[in-house]
From Swiss-Prot:
Record organism: Shewanella denitrificans (strain OS217 / ATCC BAA-1090 / DSM 15013)
Single GO cellular component term: small ribosomal subunit
A Pfam cross-reference name: Ribosomal_S20p
Chain residue ranges for the region called Disordered: 1-27
Gene this chain is encoded by: rpsT
General function of this protein: Binds directly to 16S ribosomal RNA.
A molecular-function term among this protein's GO annotations: small ribosomal subunit rRNA binding
Keywords attached to this entry: Ribonucleoprotein, Ribosomal protein, RNA-binding, rRNA-binding
PANTHER family per the UniProt record, alphabetical: 30S RIBOSOMAL PROTEIN S20, SMALL RIBOSOMAL SUBUNIT PROTEIN BS20C
HAMAP family recorded: Ribosomal_bS20
InterPro entries, sorted: Ribosomal_bS20, Ribosomal_bS20_sf
GO BP terms, alphabetized: translation
Protein name from the UniProt record: Small ribosomal subunit protein bS20
Length: 88
Protein backbone atom coordinates (compact mmCIF):
# COMPACT_ATOMS: atom_id res chain seq x y z
CA UNK A 1 0.00 0.00 0.00
CA UNK A 2 1.26 3.45 -0.92
CA UNK A 3 2.13 5.53 2.13
CA UNK A 4 3.47 8.81 0.79
CA UNK A 5 1.49 11.32 -1.23
CA UNK A 6 3.66 10.82 -4.31
CA UNK A 7 3.38 7.03 -4.06
CA UNK A 8 -0.41 7.29 -3.91
CA UNK A 9 -0.40 9.53 -6.96
CA UNK A 10 1.85 7.12 -8.84
CA UNK A 11 -0.44 4.21 -7.94
CA UNK A 12 -3.46 6.11 -9.26
CA UNK A 13 -1.66 7.08 -12.46
CA UNK A 14 -0.44 3.54 -12.95
CA UNK A 15 -3.94 2.11 -12.61
CA UNK A 16 -5.34 4.73 -14.98
CA UNK A 17 -2.69 3.91 -17.59
CA UNK A 18 -3.23 0.17 -17.14
CA UNK A 19 -6.92 0.51 -17.89
CA UNK A 20 -6.27 2.78 -20.86
CA UNK A 21 -3.69 0.38 -22.29
CA UNK A 22 -6.03 -2.58 -21.74
CA UNK A 23 -8.71 -0.80 -23.75
CA UNK A 24 -6.32 -0.05 -26.60
CA UNK A 25 -4.93 -3.59 -26.56
CA UNK A 26 -8.47 -4.97 -26.76
CA UNK A 27 -9.25 -2.70 -29.71
CA UNK A 28 -6.08 -3.85 -31.47
CA UNK A 29 -6.95 -7.51 -30.99
CA UNK A 30 -10.49 -6.90 -32.27
CA UNK A 31 -9.21 -5.37 -35.52
CA UNK A 32 -6.75 -8.24 -36.04
CA UNK A 33 -9.45 -10.82 -35.32
CA UNK A 34 -11.70 -9.21 -37.94
CA UNK A 35 -8.95 -9.66 -40.53
CA UNK A 36 -8.42 -13.29 -39.50
CA UNK A 37 -12.16 -13.98 -39.67
CA UNK A 38 -12.33 -12.49 -43.16
CA UNK A 39 -9.36 -14.62 -44.25
CA UNK A 40 -10.96 -17.78 -42.86
CA UNK A 41 -14.21 -17.01 -44.68
CA UNK A 42 -12.22 -16.93 -47.91
CA UNK A 43 -13.47 -13.50 -48.97
CA UNK A 44 -10.49 -11.70 -50.49
CA UNK A 45 -12.22 -8.32 -50.78
CA UNK A 46 -13.46 -8.34 -47.17
CA UNK A 47 -10.04 -9.47 -45.93
CA UNK A 48 -8.34 -6.66 -47.85
CA UNK A 49 -10.75 -4.07 -46.46
CA UNK A 50 -10.36 -5.38 -42.90
CA UNK A 51 -6.57 -5.33 -43.29
CA UNK A 52 -6.68 -1.75 -44.58
CA UNK A 53 -8.62 -0.77 -41.46
CA UNK A 54 -6.34 -2.72 -39.10
CA UNK A 55 -3.00 -1.60 -40.51
CA UNK A 56 -3.01 2.00 -39.20
CA UNK A 57 -4.28 0.80 -35.81
CA UNK A 58 -1.40 -1.68 -35.51
CA UNK A 59 1.08 1.03 -36.52
CA UNK A 60 -0.39 3.51 -34.03
CA UNK A 61 -0.16 1.04 -31.16
CA UNK A 62 3.48 0.41 -32.04
CA UNK A 63 4.14 4.16 -32.07
CA UNK A 64 2.44 4.57 -28.69
CA UNK A 65 4.60 1.78 -27.25
CA UNK A 66 1.74 -0.61 -26.60
CA UNK A 67 3.40 -3.27 -28.75
CA UNK A 68 6.92 -3.47 -30.11
CA UNK A 69 7.46 -2.12 -33.63
CA UNK A 70 8.84 -5.48 -34.75
CA UNK A 71 5.70 -7.24 -33.51
CA UNK A 72 3.58 -4.77 -35.46
CA UNK A 73 5.62 -5.42 -38.60
CA UNK A 74 5.42 -9.18 -38.08
CA UNK A 75 1.63 -9.10 -37.58
CA UNK A 76 1.09 -7.02 -40.71
CA UNK A 77 3.42 -9.18 -42.80
CA UNK A 78 1.78 -12.44 -41.75
CA UNK A 79 -1.74 -11.14 -42.33
CA UNK A 80 -0.77 -9.71 -45.71
CA UNK A 81 0.83 -13.01 -46.75
CA UNK A 82 -2.38 -14.88 -45.92
CA UNK A 83 -4.46 -12.35 -47.85
CA UNK A 84 -2.22 -12.67 -50.90
CA UNK A 85 -2.56 -16.46 -50.71
CA UNK A 86 -6.35 -16.03 -50.99
CA UNK A 87 -6.00 -14.22 -54.31
CA UNK A 88 -3.83 -16.94 -55.82
Amino acid sequence: MANSKSAKKRALQSEKRRQHNASRRSMLRTYVKKVIAAIKSGDHKAATEAFAAAQPIVDRMATKGLIHKNKAARQKARLNTKIKALAA
